[in-house]
């Protein structure tokens, strides 16, 4: 059974995540004191129910040692996983402005911006040990819920899930990436008027890139690098490995290469997911 601990900065989507987990059959508790986690787990162990608990600055333990002690006292039947949600500073400010809610750390002497920064410092111990960090800056409520369902329900027990995601540098680097590869030096289909409106998922774009030796070399060397270190990553008790491939706009080269890498590791029996940030954004 899984004990999913959901944390993150206020406004990043913890309530949405908790509702999505509840829909997946998790027993969800909002803001349970950390010291009570073992008691909750023991209560649910006999019922064979996975649990999800949110932790934020309101119920953060006074020291990291208290959190570690709670984790060590969990029943053996439970496997703890820490999900940390985040968003860029401007997005958090906009969300608070839209909802007109008060930040948990806001006060007469502390602005919203300062409260967000202070919260980041307080939550850093949890962020640093997270199994999965998700950037929700460009996600809608439904996209976040669907992403969690896909990743959690698609994950096989104790197996590393490899996530290959394409992005455009002009939109910013994904903060949830473990590795970032820049492919802006490769031949660009954008300069072919016929290929410009297409994406890296279309066959003419794939054929264009497939004609270039440097594209083949990059894919081969990147997958060789990942294969070299994958055994150590798999034994490092982590659930996800996110590999981000970036080109200028996130439409052609990065999409094609992310798909090629995903197909390769999928053919080797790995648990693989692919995501294309720019293409998904264009659909909304």
From Swiss-Prot:
Annotated stretches, region: RNA-binding: 266-284
UniProt keyword annotation of RNA-binding present: yes
InterPro entries membership: P-loop_NTPase, RapZ-like, RapZ-like_N, RapZ_C
Binding site for ATP: 8-15
Pfam families named among the record's database cross-references: PapZ_C (PF22740), RapZ-like_N (PF03668)
Keyword field contains Transmembrane: no
Function: Modulates the synthesis of GlmS, by affecting the processing and stability of the regulatory small RNA GlmZ. When glucosamine-6-phosphate (GlcN6P) concentrations are high in the cell, RapZ binds GlmZ and targets it to cleavage by RNase E. Consequently, GlmZ is inactivated and unable to activate GlmS synthesis. Under low GlcN6P concentrations, RapZ is sequestered and inactivated by an other regulatory small RNA, GlmY, preventing GlmZ degradation and leading to synthesis of GlmS.
Subunit (UniProt): Homotrimer.
HAMAP family membership: RapZ_like
Protein's name according to its UniProt entry: RNase adapter protein RapZ
Species for this entry: Salmonella arizonae (strain ATCC BAA-731 / CDC346-86 / RSK2980)
Gene: rapZ
């Amino acid at each position: 059974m899984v004990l999913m601990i959901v944390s993150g900065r206020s406004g990043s989507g913890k309530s949405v995540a908790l509702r999505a987990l509840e829909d997946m059959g998790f027993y969800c508790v909002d803001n349970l004191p950390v010291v009570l986690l073992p008691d909750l787990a023991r209560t649910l162990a006999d019922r064979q129910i996975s649990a999800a608990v949110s932790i934020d600055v309101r119920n953060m333990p006074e020291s990291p040692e208290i959190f570690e002690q709670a984790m060590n006292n969990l029943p053996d039947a439970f496997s703890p996983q820490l999900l940390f949600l985040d968003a860029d500073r401007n997005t958090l400010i906009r969300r608070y402005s839209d909802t007109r809610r008060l930040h948990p750390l806001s006060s007469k002497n502390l602005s919203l911006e300062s409260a967000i920064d202070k919260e980041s410092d307080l939550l850093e111990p949890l962020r640093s040990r997270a199994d999965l960090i998700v950037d929700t800056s460009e996600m809608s409520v439904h996209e976040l819920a669907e992403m969690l369902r896909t990743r959690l329900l698609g994950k096989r027990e104790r197996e590393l899930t490899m996530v290959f995601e394409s992005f455009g540098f002009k939109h910013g680097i994904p903060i949830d990436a473990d590795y970032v590869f820049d492919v802006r030096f490769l031949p660009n289909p954008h300069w072919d008027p016929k290929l410009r409106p297409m994406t890296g998922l279309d066959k003419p774009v794939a054929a264009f890139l497939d004609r270039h030796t440097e594209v083949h070399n990059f894919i081969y060397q990147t997958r060789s690098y990942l294969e070299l270190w994958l055994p150590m990553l798999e034994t490092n008790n982590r659930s996800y490995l996110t590999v981000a491939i970036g080109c200028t706009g996130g439409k052609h080269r990065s999409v094609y290469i992310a798909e090629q890498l995903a197909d390769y590791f999928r053919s080797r029996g790995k648990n693989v997911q692919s995501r294309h940030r720019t293409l998904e954004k264009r659909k909304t």
